[in-house]
Amino acid sequence: HYTWSVFHNPNALIALMGGNKAFTAMLDSVFALPPVFDDSYYGQVIHEIREMQIMNMGNYAHGNQPIQHMPYLYNWSGAAWKTQYWVREVMDRLYSAQPDGYCGDEDNGQTSAWYVFSAMGFYPVCPASNEYAIGSPLFAKVKLHLENGKTTVITSNNPQWRYIKALTVNATPNKSHWLTHQTL
């Protein structure tokens, strides 16, 4: 999982892995591999490992907070549709209003923060930057009341659709897969 922990420079990680195609294939493999694990480090099966098996999303273990940004990395490799697919899969399959509708544990609010950001349609892959990676908005309309007194409104034509056809900011087309904090 720590292979993907280059939050500050995904482009360098892509280059180290041989480019966009190889990087995307490596990301794909995380979701495709059988959920096999080695518990020798812990000496027992910890809950994150058991949850990874139950979730049936390959080796992606959403309950392990350091990997939660991983689906958003497809944005950097030219496969944004895969970000949208996997982010929505995680929201739909791993979160619900049931007693067991929350995987993993809540380390300083990270797991719930992932959901809140992702449901709004963006996520801060690198918390130390001013960029948010675009995902797949879950709501038809979200209003953010910012501390500067401004309100940002995010609308989705149909929250049932997980793929983004076009993104506009103040009626101007946005061709990138990121928003800056200043844009919000």
Summary of predicted features, one role per range:
Residues H1-V153, N158, Q182-T183:
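Active-site core of glycosidic bond-cleaving carbohydrate-active enzymes
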